[in-house]
Every structure is written in structure tokens, then in C-alpha cells.
């Protein structure tokens, strides 16, 4: 079969998508108002970079393509400013975090686009249950074969990404005792988990065309894998991260993945084999459950190693790529978080323990979401 086209991208160019919670300023619950928000944004600058998601209490911002994490950060701040200004006119708030702590998925409303209606008819309750919030990171690849290699090689590091970004300890009003409960939600979808062990762009093209011919998929979006190729963009897309509480944290995560991807593409240190996926689900569970305090089974070692230690060792290994990309400032900050076993899940638990109020927790999350910006005038505090 002929090859799928793959748009050539600059090596490790970056882009990100961030899904945020739309919050009612009085009750601090999720509120289904993305239709109103999209109408209010109609004539705004960056309008095409702010999008609805499958349920109406979600909103997504998309960066454009960047070479540097700093440039991306500047753009995300501009997008946030537009959301803040618009929210003031319709009395809503926003926050990060992979889950809303006390929302009930049964109360969610599907956004009335043709695509989302079709997905709801296909997946029914799973669609509403997917009212969880993630950061997706795109990494540019020069060729389809590079994209396939990177998709498999990064699988080794998925526990890093989950542990660093974890921000969803509460779900449906309970403490799940997971650092990232969000990362367990999509397992029920078909075509979730990991890409099949396809070793070249030719093999992937053959697989894709078969799945299309059998009417299992219509396009690349029907694959819900943790990491998937995006040939129309010339990227691979990492989909396992919870939405951080701050824009700053989203940049730390992106800067780490960008440098790691450059190391993997330049040095090809990961030997692709089925062994990568023998341990994948267990390692993923360790990160979801225990975060930075989880353990990692590495196939060339006799015993598990702490995820935290593996992250720090990896950062040492890729230092020249970090510095070459100008990401040193962000990785230094990330290192401090890892050494101190601090991710957003730890912070969320700490805030909640202060007085045991979910409403005050969400209010604090809204404040944290604005911590990158100086404009806090519109935020309503709970009484």
C-alpha cells in the first residue's frame, strides 16, 4: 500500500493544547457554558485558537508552532488574557487540574457540533465521563519514520510525564488516592492505550488504511492512544498529561519533553522491541497511582527504580540538549519540584486538607490558574 503523506516539520518544533475547566463563580462547580463563551469570542483575536471540547464545561486553547518554550509561554499568556477578559463579561471562571473535584459526569452536556454529536452516539456515557482535562504536547518530526520511532521511544518515559503533570487526586467528590485519576478514564475507549508495535511509516500506513477500509476509523482522531502520530501536522502528540494548575507548569513539562525528544531523535538510544510494552501498563499504573513516588520497571535492569530518580538521571543525560534549546531555566525549576516530590496533585491535597472544602479548593485552583497573570479583578471568592 502507498505511504500516508506526512507533513515535514522542523525537528522538535513544539505546540500544545490545554483543556480548562469552566467554573460557575457562585457554586464553584463546572458549568455548561462553552456555547456562550464561543459566541462571546467570535470577533476576538486568536479566536481560531480557542475551541470547544466534547462537553460544554470544557474549553481548549491551542498554541501555534514554536521553536522555543519561552515563545510558547508568551503566546499562552496572550490566550489566557483573552479568556479572562471574555469571562468577565459572562460571569464565569477557569481553572486547571485534570479533574473537577466534585462534578458529576451525568450532569454534563454534549457540545452540539456534528463531530461531537456523532461521538456521543457512538460512545454514549463514556463521552460524558470524559469530562476530564489534559495537556497535549506536539513534537515536530522531519519524517514519518522519525515519528514512528519517537512514538515508541517516548513510551519508555510516559510514567515521567504522568508523574510530573499529575493534578487529579479527586474525582466525583472522593479522594481516589491516585495522583492522576484522569489518566485512568480513557482506558475504556477502544483504540486507547498504546499504538500497535509498527516499526516504520510504511507499516503504519498499511495499518491505517486497513482500519479505515474496515470502517473502524474515519481519521487519525479516532485513535485515543497515549502517544499518536499526527501526519497532517508533521508531529507526534503526547496525550497523557493532566492539565497543570498553572501555565508555567505546562511550559516546564513541554520543555522537558522537547529536550528528551531531541535526545531520542539524535542519538536513538532506545532499542525498539516488544519489551517496551510488556511493562508499559504496569509502569503507567505506578505513575498514575503514586506519582513521583512510584516505581519504574526498566527492561534492562533487574529491579524497579524510583520514577523520581529516573527523571533526574534522564535530565542529566540530556543536559546538552536542554541547554542547546535554551530550556535550562525551566528544567532547573522542574528538577526542584521532582527532588521535593512536588506535583500539582500534592498541592491540591495540601490545599484541601486546610479546611476540607471542595469549593475553596476550586477557588484556589482558579487563583492559581491566574498566577501567571496580574489580572485577578474578575475572580469571585466563595463566601
Swiss-Prot record:
InterPro entries: GCL_type2/YbdK_subfam, GCS2, Gln_synth/guanido_kin_cat_dom, YbdK. The keyword Repeat does not apply. It comes from the Bacteria. Keywords: ATP-binding, Ligase, Nucleotide-binding. SUPFAM superfamilies: Glutamine synthetase/guanido kinase (SSF55931). GO terms for biological process: modified amino acid biosynthetic process. It catalyses: L-cysteine + L-glutamate + ATP = gamma-L-glutamyl-L-cysteine + ADP + phosphate + H(+). Its EC number is 6.3.2.2. Belongs to the glutamate--cysteine ligase type 2 family. YbdK subfamily. This is Putative glutamate--cysteine ligase 2-2. It comes from Legionella pneumophila (strain Paris). The lineage of its organism: Bacteria, Pseudomonadati, Pseudomonadota, Gammaproteobacteria, Legionellales.
Amino acid at each position: 500500500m502507498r505511504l500516508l503523506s506526512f507533513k515535514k516539520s522542523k525537528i522538535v518544533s513544539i505546540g500544545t493544547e490545554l483543556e480548562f475547566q469552566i467554573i460557575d463563580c457562585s457554586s464553584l462547580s463546572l458549568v455548561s457554558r462553552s456555547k456562550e463563551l464561543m459566541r462571546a469570542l467570535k470577533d476576538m483575536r486568536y479566536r481560531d485558537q480557542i475551541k470547544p471540547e466534547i462537553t460544554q464545561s470544557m474549553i481548549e486553547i491551542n498554541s501555534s508552532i514554536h521553536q522555543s518554550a519561552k515563545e510558547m509561554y508568551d503566546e499562552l499568556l496572550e490566550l489566557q488574557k483573552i479568556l479572562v477578559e471574555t469571562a468577565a463579561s459572562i460571569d464565569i471562571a477557569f481553572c486547571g487540574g485534570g479533574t473537577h473535584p466534585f462534578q458529576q459526569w451525568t450532569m454534563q452536556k454534549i457540545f452540539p457540533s456534528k463531530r461531537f454529536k456523532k461521538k456521543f452516539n457512538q460512545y454514549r456515557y463514556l463521552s460524558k465521563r470524559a469530562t476530564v482535562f489534559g495537556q497535549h504536547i506536539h513534537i515536530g518530526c522531519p519524517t514519518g519514520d522519525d515519528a514512528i520511532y519517537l512514538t515508541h521511544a517516548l513510551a519508555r518515559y510516559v510514567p515521567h510525564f504522568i508523574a510530573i503533570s499529575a493534578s487529579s487526586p479527586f474525582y466525583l467528590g472522593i479522594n481516589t488516592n491516585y495522583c492522576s485519576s484522569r489518566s485512568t478514564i480513557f482506558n475504556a475507549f477502544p483504540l486507547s492505550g498504546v499504538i500497535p508495535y509498527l516499526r516504520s511509516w510504511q507499516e503504519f500506513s498499511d495499518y491505517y488504511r486497513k482500519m479505515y477500509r474496515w470502517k473502524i476509523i474515519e481519521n487519525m482522531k479516532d485513535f485515543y492512544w497515549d502517544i499518536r502520530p499526527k501526519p497532517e501536522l508533521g508531529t507526534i502528540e503526547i496525550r497523557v498529561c493532566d492539565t497543570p494548575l498553572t501555565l508555567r507548569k505546562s511550559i516546564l513539562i513541554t520543555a522537558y519533553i522537547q529536550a528528551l525528544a531531541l535526545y531520542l531523535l539524535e542519538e536513538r538510544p532506545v532499542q525498539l522491541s516488544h519489551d517496551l510494552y510488556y511493562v508499559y501498563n504496569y509502569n503507567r499504573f505506578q505513575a498514575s497511582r503514586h506519582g513521583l513516588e512510584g516505581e519504574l520497571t526498566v527492561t534492562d535492569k533487574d529491579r524497579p527504580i524510583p520514577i523520581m530518580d529516573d527523571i533526574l538521571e534522564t535530565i542529566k543525560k540530556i543536559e546538552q540538549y536542554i541547554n542547546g534549546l535554551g530550556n535550562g531555566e525551566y528544567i532547573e525549576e522542574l528538577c526542584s519540584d521532582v527532588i521535593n516530590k512536588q506535583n500539582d496533585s500534592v498541592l491540591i491535597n495540601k490545599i484541601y486538607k486546610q479546611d476540607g472544602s471542595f469549593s475553596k479548593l476550586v477557588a484556589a485552583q482558579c487563583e492559581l490558574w491566574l498566577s501567571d497573570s496580574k489580572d485577578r479583578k474578575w475572580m469571585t471568592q466563595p463566601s
